[in-house]
A protein has these predicted regions:
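A structural motif corresponding to the C-terminal lobe/cap of the Radical SAM core domain
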Residues: 57-60, 72-172
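Conserved SAM/AdoMet-binding glycine-rich loop
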Residues: 1-115
Length: 172
């Protein structure tokens, strides 16, 4: 169980050891399948791809909480990745793991999000055709970086309209 599997092993070994862990778990008698949750794109462990392709116990399921695709918004959200890196990650997953199921979550209405940022996100969703997608409106929560430093400047009605537009596109 982890909030971000991408970092497994970095604390003790200075590198990802996720593939090694998953191989060990898959070898255990009685384990029928393994589904890995939450790979943040900035530190994706690419060595897991061959294992997911080769081992039928490891589900070809990727839960990637991308949040946004606009480089400007990714920087504002402190996501430590870029649009180009994200698109390359998705391309590699689909190429190296045929039949992969990719799920993501997106966040709209983050402080400073413009209509142009949102349109870029909408176009990205249209192009990628995720198997599963969730989208949430930004919520100005106490104790967060954005709450302390940024103004919640996107009206709630705009946030809700953006959620609806993305979900309508995803479901079409």
């Amino acid at each position: 169980i982890a909030q971000d599997l991408s970092f497994y092993g970095h604390d003790l070994y200075g590198e990802s050891r996720l593939a090694e862990l998953v191989r060990g778990i898959a070898a255990l008698e009685g384990i029928e399948w393994i589904r890995l949750h939450y790979f943040y794109p900035s530190q994706f462990p690419f060595d897991i791809l061959p294992l997911m392709h080769e081992n039928p116990k490891v589900l070809r399921y990727f839960d990637l909480p991308l949040q946004h695709i606009s480089d400007r918004m990714l920087h504002a959200m402190k996501r430590h990745t870029t649009r180009a890196e994200t698109e390359e990650l998705l391309r590699r997953i689909r190429k190296e793991v045929p039949g992969a199921v990719i799920r993501t979550t997106l966040l709209v209405g983050y402080p400073g999000e413009t209509e142009q940022d949102f349109e870029e996100l909408l176009k990205f969703v249209r192009e990628q055709r995720f198997e599963r997608l969730g989208v949430f409106p930004y919520s100005h929560e106490e104790g967060t970086y954005a709450y302390e430093r940024l103004e919640d400047d996107v009206p709630e009605a705009v946030k809700q309209e953006r959620v609806a537009r993305i979900m309508e596109l995803q479901e079409s």
